[in-house]
Amino acid sequence: MKVRASVKKLCRNCKIVKREGVIRVICSAEPKHKQRQG
């Protein structure tokens, strides 16, 4: 999980979701693409 100021989709499988007020990127194809804004 990367913590970044600006989260971006890194591939076409990445999805941006908002959970409990935190913006996250989840990716089914590449788990290394997981990010959250912080």
Curated annotation (Swiss-Prot):
GO annotation, cellular component aspect: cytoplasm; ribonucleoprotein complex; ribosome
Gene Ontology MF annotations: structural constituent of ribosome
Record-given protein name: Large ribosomal subunit protein bL36A
Organism: Enterobacter sp. (strain 638)
InterPro entries for this protein: Ribosomal_bL36 (IPR000473), Ribosomal_bL36_sp (IPR035977)
Family membership noted in the UniProt record: Belongs to the bacterial ribosomal protein bL36 family.
NCBIfam families membership: rpmJ_bact (TIGR01022)
A Pfam short name: Ribosomal_L36
Keywords: Ribonucleoprotein, Ribosomal protein
Biological classification of the source: Bacteria, Pseudomonadati, Pseudomonadota, Gammaproteobacteria, Enterobacterales
Domain of life: Bacteria
BP GO terms, sorted: translation
